[in-house]
């Protein structure tokens, strides 16, 4: 077994993994970096379709310390995003430290607070800590319906090109960004396209008044004010969703991730996409809907999202709520495990750019502080009143402000940690001839 106990392991070479590696270099934190794929890019390398473009904008997606090229359009393509991520890695000399085609299959916390990491090759190494930046766009979430569909049935992650839809009767299930992109492509190349929605969504155009919607000046205002003005703008620009045959949204805007797509409503009005309610059951190639209607399809595409899960970690190490919300403090910190960090499981309302660099810098600061503590810093955060997340959707402006404050407040956790240790030491000393057994709240790994 290879001894890497003075290093961290960074898992993933996508946007988050690369930013983490740069932050570790800047903070002089020794690390190795691995990725299961053959090159840089993460989800942009293996998980998106050939015609994909970002839905936010280049200025809300670019790294804070590495702007995108000036000649990039407002909504760069998959190929441009890959080129950008590669240029970021090369500019900061990150590539030379990445081991590609190296898949992690198990991470085991050891009693001495190190981590045993096993790879698909069978190799094992011991690390001081692990930063998991492998993303959450890989365990597909499929809907559960009665019966089986006899035609082509696949997840949006397995969609790569319009040829998969050409001259076919296509049903797309879901109203998120990928589902609506695929429905729009099916409207262009398919024989027909239907879109099944279980609930109402907020559909926003990618631009408002000539500017990317994600770059609206309104993002600096409180959410209540943003909601008021965006709803007013949508009423002027789009009208009512019911006029397109769509159900009304069943939630306030930004309570769930809005869908940014400028083509969906266009194709609905042109009759190239037909809105449908939720599916009731499959019967051969016939799909029955909850309103009693039915139709025959050649292909069903499920744009129904992903589960957040960590199969390479022992069960219970990371608690996940509702299948999509990792219970971590400060966006990455576990309560009971020192130096095991879970990155990138939240979803900004728009591009990752404003958050990924400062959050990686904050992680480096947290690691430095953990070195000065005996207790897990997550446990100290818990006793300091830091809250667990209640939604996977993050307001980037609010989160950025919080990280700026955290730069100065995090060191105060050292004092809190000393008080916690003293408190429990007093409990030990108060019990003569009885060995202190830590309660479940104080067990560390």
Question: What label would you give each PLM region?
Answer:
Residues 2-40, 123-125, 130-259, 266, ...:
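Rossmann-like dinucleotide-binding core of oxidoreductases
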Residues 47-70, 213-229:
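N-terminal glycine-rich dinucleotide-binding loop that anchors FAD/FMN and/or NAD(P) in oxidoreductases
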Residues 62-78, 116, 166-167, 244-255:
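Helix-loop-beta segment of a Rossmann-like dinucleotide-binding subdomain
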Residues 74-138, 267-271, 281-286:
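Feature captures the FAD/FMN-dependent oxidoreductase FAD-binding
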Residues 100-102, 155, 197, 275-277, ...:
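Short loop/edge segments at beta-strand edges and connector loops
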Residues 130, 134-158, 188, 290-326:
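Glycine-rich beta-alpha-beta "Rossmann" dinucleotide-binding loop(s) and their flanking helix/strand
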Residues 205, 326-330, 339-445:
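C-terminal, flexible cofactor-proximal segment of oxidoreductases
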Residues 247-318, 389-445:
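C-terminal catalytic lobe of FAD-dependent flavoproteins
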């Amino acid at each position: 077994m290879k001894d890497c106990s003075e290093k961290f392991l960074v898992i993933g070479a996508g946007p988050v993994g690369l930013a983490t590696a740069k932050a570790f270099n800047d903070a002089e934190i020794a690390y190795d970096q691995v990725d299961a794929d053959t090159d840089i890019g993460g989800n942009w390398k293996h998980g998106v379709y050939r015609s994909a473009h970002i839905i936010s904008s280049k200025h809300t997606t670019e790294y804070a310390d590495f702007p995108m090229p000036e000649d990039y359009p407002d909504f760069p393509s998959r190929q441009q995003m890959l080129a950008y991520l590669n240029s970021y890695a090369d500019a900061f000399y990150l590539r030379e430290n990445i081991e590609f085609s190296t898949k992690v299959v198990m991470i085991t916390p050891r009693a001495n607070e190190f981590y045993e990491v096993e790879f698909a090759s069978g190799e094992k190494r011991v690390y001081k800590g692990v930063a998991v930046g492998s993303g959450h766009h890989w365990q597909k979430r499929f809907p559960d319906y009665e019966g089986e569909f006899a035609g082509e049935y696949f997840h949006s992650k397995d969609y790569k090109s319009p040829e998969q839809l050409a001259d076919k009767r296509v049903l797309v299930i879901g109203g998120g960004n990928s589902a609506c992109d695929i429905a729009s492509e099916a409207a262009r190349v398919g024989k027909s396209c239907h879109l099944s929605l279980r609930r109402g969504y907020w559909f926003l155009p990618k631009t408002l008044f000539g500017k990317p919607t994600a770059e609206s000046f309104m993002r600096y205002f409180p959410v209540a004010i943003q909601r008021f003005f965006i709803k007013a703008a949508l009423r002027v620009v789009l009208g009512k969703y019911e006029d397109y045959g769509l159900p009304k949204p069943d939630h306030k805007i930004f309570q769930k991730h809005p869908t940014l797509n400028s083509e969906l409503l266009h194709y609905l009005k042109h009759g190239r996409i037909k809105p449908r309610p939720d599916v009731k059951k499959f019967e051969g190639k016939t799909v029955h809907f909850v309103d009693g209607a039915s139709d025959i399809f050649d292909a069903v595409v499920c744009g129904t999202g992903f589960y957040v899960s960590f199969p390479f970690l022992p069960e219970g190490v990371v608690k996940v709520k509702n299948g999509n919300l990792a219970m971590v403090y400060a966006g990455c910190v576990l309560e009971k495990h020192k130096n095991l960090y879970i990155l990138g499981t939240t979803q900004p309302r728009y591009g990752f750019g404003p958050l990924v660099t400062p959050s990686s810098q904050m992680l480096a600061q947290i690691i430095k502080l953990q070195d000065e503590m005996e207790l897990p810093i997550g446990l100290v955060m818990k006793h300091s009143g830091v809250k667990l997340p209640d939604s996977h959707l993050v307001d980037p402006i609010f989160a950025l402000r919080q990280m700026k404050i955290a730069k100065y407040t995090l060191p105060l956790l050292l004092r809190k940690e000393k008080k916690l240790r003293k408190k429990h030491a007093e409990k030990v000393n108060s019990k003569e001839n009885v060995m202190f057994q830590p309660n479940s709240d104080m067990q560390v790994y």
